[in-house]
């Protein structure tokens, strides 16, 4: 079966042959002889061949292609026929009729490329001709892009490209065709560069020998005069002049170019000629000209005609730096004869495509066309091509790198703006194709291309940045981006120059500079900054390089400055600048996020990988992060309710802690080339740590300063650098020479002066040795040498410099001349020649030296011989053509070339190493440098912009900055950010009344507020200063009533709901105002809606609703609830911010302070787990508010409530409970007047506290505090004076004395035991810094600034306690039922609550402890006294003006703006808060008031009775418990003496006290309780002394009190009470008569009882007592008589005793007949008359001895301990009682026995004994003897007795312990 492809070819043959035959050429009527026409002949041959085969693969591609290609080559065919042939060829390629694997394919492709690129045809009209050209393009495109195209050689590819370029740049062709050519080129370039990675680098030798064939020319149009129209005949004669290789002809522009002259006229001229001018402006490759570089070779259809073409040319590429010459490669020139052979052509001729390369001859022509070298070439498919000569059939080498390099070079040459041949179109085309090339291939991997990029390409691109054509400018920016994106590591200094250029464009103030250029430059910067790691690389490679600009820093400053519009209007440039700044933030933020996630993943992995460390060890990544987290300060990342919390600081990535050079693998493979990255010499390893970079930057600053100083005075500069340690001392010449060579900022003139100095000869030698002169001609070396410094003018200096130079040059080049003198002479001659040739002054005088003269001057200088003439000639021409100059001092191109060559030179040195770093390295350093400018720019843009997107972008920027600062723990950054944002919330600036509407209607403020709160919630950990601003915003929201209800409602003890609002209720206006207003509106006849008091408008209401909604989303409360997650430092700052709103400030507002206080308290409670750390702050603040308050106000009340709330919640925490209870003493330090106003709150608070926490109170001191508080609040007892004195002493800044400063009489350091505090040091004035953050644990309480006052001091302030005492106290009644404290006004409801609290303690046995029992008893007695007569004391002295106001308040606020508009606090709101005002209690509910007071008394009675009955069992259980525990501490005795002293006696006194109440009900109830108590079984254990004490302390004082007219209204009731009391007396006496008889003082006791009988008989007005008393007395006398008490033991016969006499003597005074009634029969003999007076001394002696020596056995003192409380008080831990010596008549408690060893046992009495007066005393005649009841009212005794009963203590005496309370 015949191959279908054969038919396709046959069909194409028929079409082409048919067209040829139809052509006018054959239209004669002569039959065509096909044999004679070569074209038809070859077609007929092909037909025969095709007919003879069945498979197309049986014949070579060349066979079936040749006839078609001959048609294409033929000059005689017309356009349409050529077009048909081209179509056929295209079809063969498209249909893949050519087998790529066939061995003849390569040759076929080569022929095809040659034919199509040299196509000729007879033109018809331009349009038809263009169709043919279009088809040529099509074939060339298909040829290169189909698989068979890979067989093309380098030369063919270059020809193909050149053909396309010609069409593209031929301006006479239509735009469509040109654009098609352009697209074709794009496709071809893309293909070639896409294949680039498949080609391997050619060895240098190969490149050198072959590249000469591949010169594409960026053609050059010469001057118009040079070129003529070429007219050609169809068959011109051939002139081929062979030129030997190597011959050069000078070209018009002075460059010497390798030439190749070929004969032949390849063109048929176009019918329309072009004017010379337009051609010059147009493309460079259309018509021939002498220096256009176009090849003029005659190529006819037969291949053999081409054989006489010869390639020639120098292998060396010569370039010139003059503009215009471009990089013209080897070019050819028209043979001079050529013009003579040009003849007139036919009119039907057409212009053909100008031909391709002058040297690209067909590879089939010559054996040397395929480079002959000894290497085989293997194409990408693995086919090996062996080079051999043509005769053996050369294998054609497929194209590779050489043609790509040539194409690349050509494209670069097109972009040279200084080449006059390059039109704008060409430059643009070049840039476009370079873009395609760079986009398609990793060009940097190819070294041959890299060289071109580094030099010409970058140079042309930078030059294009200065052109004014925006399209070229934009295109060059695009190419630059591609370059630096992919290969910046090879282009360090090029990148520096590029960025500097961009910065210049951005900042230049040139009005001609279009705005768009700046915008594009900025966009280019932004684009670069977005490349990952780019910014970091800028920083590390430039800012951290000694001799580079600080690119990153400068750019950041520039962008920041540029983000601020000068005019106030935001343009794109400003936003672009912001974008650039934000890219740094964005990338850093994303790295931080990644690190956090990575850390979390690591942690998860670690958790799953336990046990064992396989996961950690096996994974280098893990190790790295492990190292990071363990080295840094950070302890990892905690997740909680708020999402992520970032560690506060520390380096978190590889940059932290010096990663050794073991990290190279990680760092090195980031760039395009994965080879080992070179390390810059300035770094210790590939990723230096940040500390090292900072050192380098500091060093760089010093170097710049040193350089500046050197440029003024070299020595000074060197000295400066030596001082700073950058250069060694003494000077190291090598080091300095190196510095002089590598520092580009040094002034060349100064270098010259310094090194040429005679003193620095050694330095000069070192300096010269830094040059490498190997292989350089002397003049070249000299040129290099003299570029490094300015040659001074003096001859000796020049001599020195040249001498050292020539020595070094000789040693580098193996001493080429006879001796050093010859060398020196030649060098000098070169300098002279340079001066002669180029110095204007010299040229004016003499003609410049010729070559001959130069040679002549040097005759015989080379050791007597001549130098080589060629060398001299070369030197002469080099100097003549190019002056040796100091390029830095030149301008224009000379300087530019020099700067560029220096740049290339530096790039090739180790300095040019560009470090690629992994993304995320050095983020912290970069952020530290950029955050300031960025936040400033963000704030500005946020403020000025109205566009939603821009605002969102700014906010996103803020959030990212916050996230980064949180990640790295940068508080200052975060504070700055929060402060900036707070300004935009509009909360700080607005007045309160406008705030809701202004804030509500400002969307930007909403965004800012939400952001502030969101950031504070999320990153509060690192907030410091910023808290103040946030709190200020919160306060504003509070003032404007925009906060959620939960934040303004606070706990309250008294309010029935348990909560009150901190905000005043809205009241329309108070009564007075409204009256006036209504009157005014009535006068003006206006309705209320017209008056000024109008309701808020709907807009305002809507705005307020929006504002409330926004605040709800902000969730400010979260700030408090989540404060428990804050780091301690941040928490302390937050508390500081809240504390700062105190009454000291000028613009203080009470409500604000209360709000801040409440927030502070809530925060403390939220942080109760670590309350110890913040306790000091909050306690100081509360102290300040409570103790400094001069008057009651709402804030004081909130402070008191707050203190109690804290105590209630914190007492459960063991570690802080002691301090918390101690802090409650703050309340005792308050001014009594202020404290009384908050008594309700305190009473309710204490009740709550005891109910919830009684079990957590353990120490006696703490109980003492609580009971003292209960006493002060419940009964108006004044707080202990010791505390008050210290509180007063704490005037602002006075600083009270500490314990150590006070004179102390405490032996044995009792103070350590006291456990109480003064405010002297801790509660310092807040203005004073220093003592705030001390921890105050119990152990350290004494040192922490508390004045520790123990219970003893409070009970018993001794003279040494630092209080001034106003002289001795007046006498006190020793036996009073009352506690004797001066009770101030108190509040019955508070008392009731306190009694409830007491009841709670007493009724629960668990809460009664040895520590609080006596305190409890004492407090009960004080409450009893307070409740007496229905709390009559609470009625006295009560101020009636307690309504809530803060008039006299020290905390008054100054009026501030808008304060008049603050709503007045509603009268119903806080009116009764402080004073629980009397009007309400006294007037409003009198009945309930009395019910309450009655309730109190009954409760107290019940409590006392309960305690009394349970005392014995309680004490015995304690004693038992202590025995089991065998613990130390105070021994607990359960004997009757202890019980009497500590429990029974005081309780009985308390009950007795209530027996004296004015209310009958209470009296009777109390008497019943007393009777029950006295007769209780437990009391039977008491001995005589205790019973005597019972009479003295309980019964006698009771009877005395009842003698007073207690209840005048209830006479009968009083009678009954007195009767019951006297009956009780006699009952008790008789019941315990036996033990009482053992008393030595029995007589006195008995007489006292008789005395009371006497008084009671005469006390009442009714007969009740006068009848009852005699009966009682009779009963007692009879019992005593029966017991033979009246019989004298020693008298003879048991006669009547002295007692009998005294008894009747006393009774006779009031019942004279009783004796007769009772004892008629009984006659007691009188004693001896000689002894009437001896009895008196007896009584006296008894008393005296008893009183004088209390320790006498069997003789307890009658007055015992002279106190109303007796012994029982001596050990009471009543720390809550302060000395009240200043109040006259106040009773004192006895001194504690533990105060000092000397005071054990009862103290000695300090008064003389009482003396019984003789009965015959004249004073007593007819008067009941008042002196007998010595234990009664001493004031009365004193009044009736001639002898003072008590001596007044002398001032020098120590104050009696009995007077100390």
UniProtKB/Swiss-Prot annotation:
Membrane association type: Peripheral membrane protein
Q: Which Gene3D superfamilies match?
A: 1.10.220.20, Arf Nucleotide-binding Site Opener,domain 2
Would you tell me the protein name for this molecule? Golgi-specific brefeldin A-resistance guanine nucleotide exchange factor 1
User: Where are the compositionally biased (Low complexity) regions?
Assistant: 1286-1296, 1776-1793
Note down the stretches annotated as region DCB.
1-211
Q: Name one Pfam family in it.
A: TPR_28
User: Which residues are modified to Phosphothreonine?
Assistant: 507, 1337
List, as start-end ranges, the regions of compositional bias called Polar residues: 253-262, 1297-1310
Instruction: Recall the taxonomic lineage recorded for the source organism.
Output: Eukaryota, Metazoa, Chordata, Craniata, Vertebrata
Q: Which residues carry this modification: Phosphotyrosine?
A: 1316
Stretches for region Phosphatidylinositol-phosphate binding: 886-1372
